[in-house]
Design a protein with these regions (language model features):
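Cell-envelope/extracellular polymer assembly enzymes that use nucleotide-activated donors
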Residues: 9-11, 40, 189
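A conserved acidic beta->alpha catalytic loop
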Residues: 45-54, 73
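Short beta-strand-to-loop acidic/aromatic patch adjacent to the donor-nucleotide binding site
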Residues: 91-102
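Conserved nucleotide-sugar donor-binding catalytic segment
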Residues: 150-202
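Conserved donor NDP-sugar-binding/catalytic core segment of glycosyltransferases
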Residues: 107-139
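Short, acidic, metal-binding catalytic loop of nucleotide-sugar glycosyltransferases
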Residues: 28-38
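Conserved short acidic donor-positioning loop in nucleotide-sugar-dependent glycosyltransferases
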Residues: 30, 46-47, 75, 99-100
Length: 202
């Protein structure tokens, strides 16, 4: 990895639109991470109308939270990601958290960033558990995409519908490739693009 200077080692990126029921928990999960490095949380609020914007303003006292309302009105999830990644405060690693998700524990962000250095990769993909709103496990349970292998990951990726989560990216590479401005399959598309030239860590 190059020595490009970043103020923050990592940024948790949360695109959101109308998720008043879950956005507070998602942001709290991100802000509660315990790390050995500085990080922030960038929320791209895609013109919410259900109180999500006001809920995010409740975190205004925490300067680690950057709340962005894009000027554009035609952004999909991928477009929101591009806004966040190109923000001047985006960290060296851009780490996904969906607006209706939680990290497993307060050490998740540290584990993800450590993996970048251990495996010298451009993207890291983890494992997640499907639950209901009460955090009870629901089918299909754990999603780990074990069909991915170091030797044949890119080829296997063409045979599955998604690459897994949480996803994290080395920001300089992501800024060059960019997400497609869509709200379905944008993560799969960027993963396939990265896998053509770079290593994806698991």
């Amino acid at each position: 990895m190059d020595r490009e200077a970043f103020e923050f080692e990592a940024s948790v990126i949360i695109p959101v639109r109308n998720r008043i029921r879950t956005i507070r928990d998602a942001v709290n999960s991100a802000l509660s991470q315990q790390t050995t490095f500085p990080f922030n949380v960038i929320v791209i609020d895609n013109h919410s109308t259900d109180g999500t914007t006001e809920a995010l303003q409740e975190f205004s006292a925490d300067n680690r939270l950057i709340h962005i309302i894009p000027q554009e009105n035609d952004l999909g999830i991928g477009g929101c990601w591009n806004v966040g990644v190109h923000h001047e405060k985006c960290g060296k690693f851009a780490v996904q958290l969906d607006s209706d998700d939680l990290y497993k524990d307060e050490h998740t962000l540290q584990k993800i960033v450590d993996t970048f250095y251990q495996q010298n990769c451009a993207m890291v993909i983890g494992t997640y558990l499907m639950t209901d709103f009460q955090m009870n496990e629901i089918a299909p349970g754990v999603i780990d995409h074990k069909e991915w292998t170091v030797e044949d990951g890119p080829n296997n990726a063409l045979r599955i519908n998604g690459l897994g989560a949480p996803r994290a990216f080395y920001t300089p590479i992501l800024r060059k490739i960019k997400f497609p401005n869509t709200s379905y399959g944008e993560d799969y598309a960027i993963g396939l693009s990265i896998s053509r030239e770079y290593t994806i860590g698991r």
